[in-house]
Amino acid sequence: MKKRVTLSAVALVAVLASAVQAQPVARDGLLADAAGRTVYTFDKDTAGKSNCTGGCLAAWPAFVAKPGAKPQGDFGLIEATGGQQQWTLKGKPLYYFAGDTQAGERNGDGSGGVWHVVPAPAKY
């Protein structure tokens, strides 16, 4: 039992560490992380505040910034669940979609009529 718990804890740390990212980048006209994973916005969020909690975060994980990341231009940071920093664009929190398993996928676009891919800003 102890071995199983230890392995589960190690796996969880690996997953959380892989979700921590540098500032978004432009890829194929959309915002993505450095690995090419598409990021999304949620219409029910308000500027500077995420309204995606609980089960929502399981399907739409926050796009979490690396420790020490600094806001730049239209990109900002808000406190995410767990005390980490979540990237924002013009105050709108950014997320991944758990259903996107490969770089460049956009399977969450339009989901529920409230989730959207993010076009890369023109100056990007």
What is each stretch, according to the model?
Residues 8-17:
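Bacterial N-terminal signal peptides
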Residues 20-124:
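Compact beta-sheet-dominated domain cores in extracellular/mature segments
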Residues 1-9:
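Bacterial N-terminal signal peptides that target proteins for export
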